[in-house]
Amino acid sequence: MASHQEQSYKAGETRGKAQEKTGEAMGTMGDKTQAAKDKTQETAQSAQQKAHETAQSAKDKTSQAAQTTQERAQESKDKTGSYMSETGEAIKNKAHDAAEYTKETAEAGKEKTSGILGQTGEQVKQMAMGATDAVKHTLGLRTDEGNKEHVSSAPSTTTTTTTRETQRK
C-alpha cells in the first residue's frame, strides 16, 4: 500500500505544482491585460486631446477666413456699386439698340418669309391642279375640246434652283 500512498502523494504534488503554475500564468496575464488597458486608455485620451486641438484650430482658421471674406466682399460691393452706376446708362443704351436691331431684323425676315410662302403656296396649288388633270387625262375623263371648263387657266411656271458652293478657308 505504500505504493498507493506514494502515487497519491505524487498526484497531489503534481496537482499543486500545476495550480501554482496556473496561478502564476493567470497573474502574468492579468498584469499584461491591465498594462494593455492602461496603454489603450492613454492612447485614446491622447487622440481625444489631439482631435480637440485640431478642431479648435480649424474653427479658429475658419472664423478668421470668414471675417476676411466678409471684409473683401464689402470692399468688392463698394467697388462694384460705383462701377455699375457709371456704366448703367451705357448698358441700358446698348440693350435698347440691340432690341431695336432685333425688331428690325425680325420684320425684314417676316416680309421675306411671307413672300416665299405665297409663291410656294401658288406653286403647290398649280402642281396639284396639274396632277389632277394628268389623272383625268389618263383615265379618259377629260378631253381638251369637250371639257374646257376643267382645263387649268393658271399660268405654268418653271422654278430653277441655284446652289452655290461656299469655300471655307
Curated annotation (Swiss-Prot):
Keyword tags: Cytoplasm, Stress response
GO biological process: protein stabilization; response to cold; response to freezing; response to water deprivation
Subcellular location: Cytoplasm, Cytosol
Chain intervals with Basic and acidic residues compositional bias: 12-23, 50-62, 89-113, 142-151
The keyword Transmembrane is assigned to this record: no
Record's GO cellular component terms: cytosol
Primary location recorded for the protein, binned into one broad class: cytoplasm
Region annotated Disordered, chain positions: 1-117, 139-169
Tissues in which the UniProt entry reports expression: Expressed in sepals, petals, pistils and stamens.
Gene3D superfamilies named among the record's database cross-references: Apolipoprotein
Induction behaviour: Induced by abscisic acid (ABA). Induced by drought stress.
Function of the molecule: Involved in dehydration and freezing tolerance. Protects and stabilizes the enzyme activities of ADP-glucose-pyrophosphorylase (AGPase) and glucose-6-phosphate dehydrogenase (G6PDH) during drought stress and freezing. Prevents aggregation of leaf soluble proteins during drought stress. Does not stabilize liposomes during drying and rehydration.
Family label: Belongs to the LEA type 4 family.
Name the UniProt record assigns to this protein: Late embryogenesis abundant protein 7
Organism whose genome encodes this protein: Arabidopsis thaliana (Mouse-ear cress)
